């Protein structure tokens, strides 16, 4: 006793398993006036190599993105990978080797704004004052989102041109925004 001269030996079949990386953003705070527009992961699939007894337990691979502050701009974060059983229990590997321990996740954070809609009149007669035109828009303003630098440059949302050379009374036009 006191002198243990034994070795544990594990016999198993070594396999490879490839899993898609799922991104979760449950632990992020997005600042007021901003939205998380999209997430992109640098590596979409991860390959594991190890004993089948360990790999058989794994159902999902997750990159759980965390950030300590409020997000107001796009950012890329190195995010550790976590593996779960089909029942949601985290799997800790003893013998399995990971192709990657973490992945880079890019979070596209966009600023939101409500902007007045603006139409442009083209082919008007010379010295024509388009402020004298009476017209109605189905929407006076629209909510938009985009990179903060672009949104901050906008004071109105241009939705298209109305060609006065082809204009007729009671005409209804559509502009896709």
Please place each PLM-identified region on the residue numbering.
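Structured interface patches
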Residues: 1-174
